[in-house]
Amino acid sequence: MQVHAKMKLTWVRRQFRHPRMLCLLICWMMITQAFSQSVPMKISALSDNHVLVSLTPEQRYLLLPIEEDEAQAALKVIVDNEVVETLNVKLAADHVDYSVPLDLGRYTNKPVLLDVTFHNERRSTGDVKDFTAWKAMQSAAHFDTTNREKYRPLYHHTPLWGWMNDPNGMFYKDGVWHLYFQYNPYGSQWENMTWGHSTSKDLVHWTFEGCPIRPDGLGTIFSGSAVVDKTNSAGMGKDAVVAFYTSAGTSQVQSLAHSSDNGMSFTKYDGNPILTDKVPDFRDPKVFWNADLNAWNLILAAGQQMNIYSSKDLKNWTFESAFGREYGNHDGVWECPDLMKLPVEGTKEAKWLLLCNINPGGPFGGSATQYFVGSFDGHKFVCESQPKVTKWMDYGKDHYATVTFDNAPDNRRVALAWMSNWQYGNQVPTQQFRSANSVPRDLGLFVDQGETYVSVTPSRELLALRGDKVSHPTAACEILIDLRSQAQPTTITLSNAHHEQVVMTYQPKDHTFSMDRTASGLTDFSNHFKAITIAPTHGKLTQLRLFVDKCSVEAFDASGRMAMTNLVFPKVPYDKLTVSKGARVTIYDLK
């Protein structure tokens, strides 16, 4: 769906940083209202929970009023006696929390029938014909995406509106980073899984491109990956972008789509599904070119293990092996895998890193990313650690579904994660949108006491965000803390005038770093949100890098030995930093 032109996320995020823009924003909202109008409609109640709404849209968008506390309703859009779209939506019964756009541009000035079936568990007991939704529904030429959320990050990717979770299908091509993501364009809670799409030239400033892969007869569109087919092995064109995703219908099967316009639009393969299994949780295909095998590999989650396949043409896949039954954490569902070859720091050796996202089962509850290091010959992955060893990529509560970009320049492995947790992702205190991605991170490997671990370093593109050095924290800042002279425990506190604070502690003797967000701001939206998270530092920390944004604090050891990501929701941004004596501090405002 294209909204206005391609809207720049950075523009809408930064309006309220410039007070003089306020008048312009108000004028813009007034102009937008002038382009919307109420919709004449006929409402026919077939039962207490079944309504037919007849209307003739005169403009592109039908704005659906949403009430988040209501139950889902199944909505079918019918044109010329054909169902052209099916979605689940929480239509407003009593009040409107926000509206979402239903694109009816192809059917302007044609009769459209909305067949709406409300679930029996709906909260409202009133007559469905009297729902607020029918009175508040509007037709509009444009959908206003001006930011209305105080907690929208200033330099993290977010959807303009709606719900987002897993990053999907990420690749780099012709100077552009492509990020697809699990997306609900019809509400700010999980539902209607679709692939949203954003692009960037610098991994920081993102442009929303629409929804190129939408649900179909095989089901909604769950997570997956994309590759650049440089040799036309699939027969879909040299340098075609080939996407793989899980079709989630009555069962979970794997499907393929290809793009000849650099991922802006996709054509689904007539032979879908390309891979099936009887396992209920069979999803999230990650495909990559294996130069050692001279073939393609695919890894996906199949219950409590990862299945590995190979192919010469991206369409016909041969099962090779399975990994994981006796390894790592099995307290939740395994999903969203990735598998890559990485150099080991300080050696001429390379090893394979297998990412396995798990929910629940994280070290502090809910979802998290565990990983395994070993060898892979294109057929079988062999983990070098003992089966009961569990390693975590990030020791915060809010780092999940981590995957990497295909075809990244300079053989880099750049990762993004969903910056939230399934324990409370649907309840965080925003409505226009929910969820952001982590900052981009480059991955590597290092050895500590005979074990190989993943190194996680903020991507170099973030350096371009640095503005002026400032004396105190801002709503968007990077804080560097030199810890080389610290032999005693070091406490770092971010706080504001409301006595809200995030307290971090580095224990050099124990080699641990912790973050306490129990008094960080709004926490009562979930019993699972208050937390103290603790990470091993694998030796002495030399420099701590903190990335602070409107709703997050991400902590890194400058050498990549430690990463911790936590959401926070202060009433006002933290503007005070207190650090134990002896630690040198530099703060950059991020522009």
Language-model features: locations:
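Bacterial N-terminal signal peptides that target proteins for export
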Residues: 4-23
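Bacterial N-terminal signal peptides
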Residues: 22-33
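Beta-rich accessory regions
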Residues: 39-81, 104-123, 143, 346-348, ...
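Surface loop/turn signatures of beta-propeller and other carbohydrate-active proteins
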Residues: 41-48, 83-103, 131-168, 187-190, ...
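Hydrophobic core segments of beta-strands in well-ordered, beta-rich domains
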Residues: 64, 114-116, 166-186, 208-211, ...
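Structural motif
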Residues: 73-74, 125, 190-194, 251-257, ...
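Beta-propeller domains
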Residues: 74, 80, 151, 158, ...
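Beta-propeller blade signature
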Residues: 196-200, 255-262, 310-312, 367-378, ...
